[in-house]
Amino acid sequence: MTSVQIEAISTDSKDIPLQEASLDIWDKKYRLKSKTGDIIDQSIDDTFKRVARALANAELTDELRNKWYDSFLWALRRGAIPAGRITSNAGAQEHKPATSTINCTVSGIINDSMNGILEKVHEAGLTLKAGCGIGYEFSTLRPKGAYVSGAGAYTSGPLSFMDIYDKMCFTVSSAGGRRGAQMATFEIGHPDVMEFIRAKRENGRLRQFNCSLLITDEFMAAVEANENWPLAFPINEAEAAELDLDNADQVLWREWPHSDGYVCRDDGLVACRIFKTVPARRLWDMIMSSTYDFAEPGFILIDRINEMNNNWFCENIRATNPCGEQPLPPYGACLLGSVNLTRFVEKPFTDEARFNWDEYHKVARVFTRMLDNVVEINGLPLGKQRDEIARKRRHGMGFLGLGSTINMLRMKYGSPESLEFTEKVAREMALAGWEEALELSREKGPAPIMKEEFEVTGDMLRQRPELEADGYKLGDKVSGRVLHARYSRYMQKVAEINPELVDALAEEGARFTHHTSIAPTGTISLSIANNVSNGIEPSFAHHYSRNVIREGRKSKEKVEVFSYELLAYRHLVNKRAMPYAEDEASKLPDYFITAEDVTPMQHVDIQAAAQRWIDSSISKTANVPTDFPYEDFKGIYTYAHAQGLKGCTTFRFNPEAFQGVLVQERDLENTLYRFVLDDGQVVEVKGNEEIEYDGEMHTAANLFDALKEGYYGKF
């Protein structure tokens, strides 16, 4: 295990040197090296210069390129951190020409045919090879046992085809050296939904996927009312002759990703054959039990996502990127970046601690232009992906280090003042971004979708009744910029703060359709930001172990790390301070709380405070104690729905099911792992004990997980 020595050496938290684990991750993931391994980025500042130059080169003249290179470098040095694909690949085309600067993509619709399934496997392989994560909806495939007339046989169902995607992802990521990332989403009303919920209980199955359910408001209402829930799949035109479409016991009408080949009404709803009904609460308990034990499936509130989507008039979102912060349409793509909030804290840990809002606003404005320029060097492998990002110019700016910043301002994460601070951070970022969206539109032109004309449909009138109140009728033409600025629920909220800005955006069009998103930021928080808290999270712990994939090792390696705020406190206040210290002179202040000190409801409250001003979504995990009561656990999800979230994820330490990336030392100390040897002998060891196996030293917990999940020796 790596050991880090820390000493008090500075009076400025911004001057704290990177800890060994941070430098190591930067070196392995983001530092540019030649094909022969020669180092090109000599320092992190060289990485910043490479990225700033690559993005400034998207400007039209030499004068603008030089001007914005200086501004971009200024912002990077003051806390703007582009996402991993940008930091790793921008300006690196000479050395890795086939890589992308885009983190997030979603597959095209997987059509219910062998050609459709295999076509999307091929496209996904190219996408993963380029370094992008990808999401898919698999509930577009007919249920297990359904008759396939062309083959004269019965289908094996969506889950069996997911196995093909899983193997493809593992193969591509193993060959490319970077682990592939995939999200599988699944409709709560699909006949195979229960098989989807149970899928990952099988050791080693679908481990290249995060799995999430598309939860509708209708389902949540059925749970609340203790009603039955129909499981149904669309009816094609041939099947329609065998059914009475007006019989509510046989057919229901619901939204579907596409209507090609299916029976469809004028309001856009698709006829679906009811295969069976189940008590909604029974299905709910099945979801909750799986999530309690295995932290999956995730919980995506899809109606909320589509209701709040800025592109509500031309998109029906059914999938997200692998971490869930970017709900995207078919072939959708989005670039990411995060602002390190700790960089704006002045006089931390004192009565005079304050946040520099003016500089934060300025960095957010400059960073918005920087991220907009990434569209020009996206490197996406598929033409449909490139067309989609060029048409809408979506990006997702978020922040990281919220928990660390709250500590440095002497607040407690989850307290009323921290909720107020979180909402203001998100609101100020949003306002800065839309101000820049207007300026960029005036300088460079709006996103092409803003200049398009859209025909008013029955579906649009159903979603936005105010269109009719404003005099629009079926068949009228309305510009994209008006539908975006006037009728997006999110932009209507922005108009409450700055109506003149939104009026101008409706008149001229914005440079992009979406601006904000909060990613988990795990590796950039640990590396470039010196282990500030991830994204919107509190610090997991102030001194803990992180399991990292190390090239050449057969299991994950445990690395010792310290939170940024602990390093800062030791530099500025007390060099002997450590968590759990018994000596009074070494204790930390009571506001130095961690994820385990935050209640699940406080996690939801923080997410809700930010979500009001985030136009995409938020990747966040509510940590739950191992002994947290199951009935209370279910309440987290109903509370998340009531608070207006777009999704919810929980994590409860359960070593029998899986080993997390971030691990508390005392959890390992208190957990016994049982190994059965070839001769039948049983050996029990604590999770944090070092044991030798296959010529290497491993922690017991990591070796157990690698053998159980089937990835031992395959990194």
Predicted regions and their residues:
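Long, charged, mostly alpha-helical binding arms that flank functional sites
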Residues: 333-397, 407, 581-587
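Active-site cavity-forming subdomains of large catalytic enzyme subunits
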Residues: 7-16, 102-357, 380-384, 388, ...
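Catalytic alpha/beta core of large soluble enzyme barrels
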Residues: 22, 325-327, 371-376, 446, ...
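Catalytic phosphate/nucleotide-handling subdomain of diverse soluble enzymes
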Residues: 409, 417-436, 528-551
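Active-site-adjacent structural elements in folded domains
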Residues: 87-92, 357, 381-392, 405, ...
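Internal maturation/activation junctions in enzymes
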Residues: 234-235, 363-386, 412-521, 618
